[in-house]
């Protein structure tokens, strides 16, 4: 019974009808949750309602994001105002210690920064008001609209469930059966009641969403107008102060800061002290480069002398057998790499160097032969007429070239080997006289190798002045015996 004493419609419904109504409503909820396709005509009838729901969800999300942005903005304003105020105080403190024009500029700029920091904090007042209004709007207007939408969704689910129920009953409808017609009329009445409730809530939702959007626009326009007015006033005052400082400092001379030591009144000019320092630093750098290059050159010459001594000692150990096998060595050398004009162009400078030092090498070998009693001293003394031509000829090839260069012209190497073999044979005879008519065929003593080696070492005499010239061409045992 209701308040007027009339029976309610629910009291006349049986338990079976309530169960059936609950069943179809649950089936509609399941269809919506699983995302199954519904009747396209039924969905098209709710297109306007769905558009209003999208607007509501957009308003709800934007209000939440706006609250977060306002909080971050207030925090950033406080931080930048604090940093600006500290910079202004620092400039004012430094201006008290400086009585020059720079001190005046720093004092004026520091005062402007402190004033700007205080005025920037004034922006927090309209922002706080905006935040409060947005929070109130979200808590009341948006929440009330959300409650209405939830009731509307329940009514729509119930209405669509009743439609499914009526569709199922209509498939079993038989006009000749009075009982089935009565059942269809009851289901049809349920559909009409649910549709009326749904239409009423649908209208309420559409009206509240429209009112929600309009109220949000009014709120934001009022709050943001206050914020905009405050922001424009802040920038106008700050720009005015900065322009006044700029106009006051127009007559001041600019300063060039050099290593943060002192201020200069004449821009684009470097002081004499700095020039001297730069010149001194440049000279020191160049001197260091020269010293390093000399050390590297001396180190390379020492390494070359050591390698050459090792190669010469190996040649002395092998002796004549080395020359006996020289023809085979010449045959094994690649002919393509030994022939041509490239070798003569690359190593032509050695002939000039060795020929220029031939006279000095002959004097040095004579002193060595006199000091150590070489048996071939008499032989070399008997040949003064040969002069510079044999020495020049012998200085064109050094035994160490086989180790340093690793390749030679095949023909020239074979000629040299044949000459050496003939000379070794002549050195073992009883000092036979050499005819003067054939100056090209020379008899060489074993000390000619030492003479050639001394000429080779004279090339490095300037690079390594500390080496012992008496030790050239002799082993350690011979020096100890001497």
From Swiss-Prot:
Residues 365-393, 427-449 are annotated as: Disordered. GO terms for biological process: regulation of transport; spermatid development. SMART domains: Arfaptin (SM01015), ICA69 (SM01237). GO terms for cellular component: acrosomal vesicle; Golgi apparatus. Pfam families: Arfaptin (PF06456), ICA69 (PF04629). The gene is ICA1L. Residues 366-385, 428-449 have a biased composition (Polar residues). This is Islet cell autoantigen 1-like protein. Gene3D superfamilies: Arfaptin homology (AH) domain/BAR domain (1.20.1270.60). The lineage of its organism: Eukaryota, Metazoa, Chordata, Craniata, Vertebrata. GO terms for molecular function: protein domain specific binding. Residues 44-247 form the AH domain. PANTHER family: ISLET CELL AUTOANTIGEN 1, ISLET CELL AUTOANTIGEN 1-LIKE PROTEIN. InterPro entries: AH/BAR_dom_sf (IPR027267), AH_dom (IPR010504), Islet_autoAg_Ica1/Ica1-like (IPR024114), Islet_autoAg_Ica1_C (IPR006723).
């Amino acid at each position: 019974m209701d308040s007027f004493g009339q029976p309610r419609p629910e009291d006349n419904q049986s338990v079976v009808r309530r169960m059936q109504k609950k069943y179809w409503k649950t089936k509609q909820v399941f269809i919506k949750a699983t995302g199954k396709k519904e009747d396209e005509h039924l969905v098209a009838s709710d297109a306007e309602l769905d558009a209003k729901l999208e607007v509501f969800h957009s308003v709800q999300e934007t209000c939440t994001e706006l609250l977060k942005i306002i909080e971050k903005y207030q925090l950033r304003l406080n931080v930048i105002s604090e940093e600006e105020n500290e910079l202004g105080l620092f400039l004012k403190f430094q201006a008290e210690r400086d009585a020059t024009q720079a001190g005046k500029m720093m004092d004026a700029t520091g005062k402007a920064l402190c004033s700007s920091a205080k005025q920037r904090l004034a922006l927090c007042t309209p922002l706080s008001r905006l935040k409060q209004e947005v929070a109130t709007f979200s808590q009341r207007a948006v929440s009330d609209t959300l409650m209405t939408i939830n009731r509307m969704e329940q009514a729509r689910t119930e209405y669509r469930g009743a439609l499914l129920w009526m569709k199922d009953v209509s498939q079993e409808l038989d006009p000749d059966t009075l009982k089935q017609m009565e059942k269809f009329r009851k289901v049809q009445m349920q559909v009409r009641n649910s549709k009326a409730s749904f239409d009423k809530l649908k209208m309420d939702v559409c009206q509240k969403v429209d009112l929600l959007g309009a109220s949000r626009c009014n709120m934001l326009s009022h709050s943001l107008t206050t914020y905009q007015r405050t922001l424009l006033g802040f920038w106008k005052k700050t720009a005015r102060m900065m322009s006044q400082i700029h106009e006051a400092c127009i007559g001041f001379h600019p300063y060039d800061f050099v290593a943060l030591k002192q201020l200069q009144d004449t821009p684009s000019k470097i002081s004499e002290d700095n020039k001297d320092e730069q010149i001194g630093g440049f000279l020191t750098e160049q001197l260091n480069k020269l010293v390093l290059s000399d050390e590297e050159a001396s180190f390379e010459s020492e390494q070359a002398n050591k390698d050459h001594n090792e190669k010469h000692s190996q040649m002395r150990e092998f002796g004549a057998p080395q020359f006996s096998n020289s023809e085979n060595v010449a045959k094994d050398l690649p002919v393509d790499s030994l022939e041509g004009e490239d070798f003569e162009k690359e190593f032509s400078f050695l002939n000039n160097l060795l020929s220029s030092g031939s006279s000095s090498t002959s004097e040095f070998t004579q002193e060595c032969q006199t000091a150590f009693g070489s048996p071939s001293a008499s032989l070399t003394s008997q040949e003064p007429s040969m002069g510079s031509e044999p020495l020049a000829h012998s200085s064109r090839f050094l035994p160490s070239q086989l180790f340093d260069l690793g390749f030679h012209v095949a023909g020239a190497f074979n000629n040299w080997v044949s000459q050496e073999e003939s000379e070794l044979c002549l050195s073992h005879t009883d000092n036979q006289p050499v005819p003067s008519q054939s100056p090209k065929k020379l008899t060489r003593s074993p000390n000619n190798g030492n003479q050639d080696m001394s000429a080779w070492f004279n090339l490095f005499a300037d690079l390594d002045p500390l080496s012992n010239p008496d030790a050239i061409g002799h082993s350690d045992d011979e020096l100890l015996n001497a």
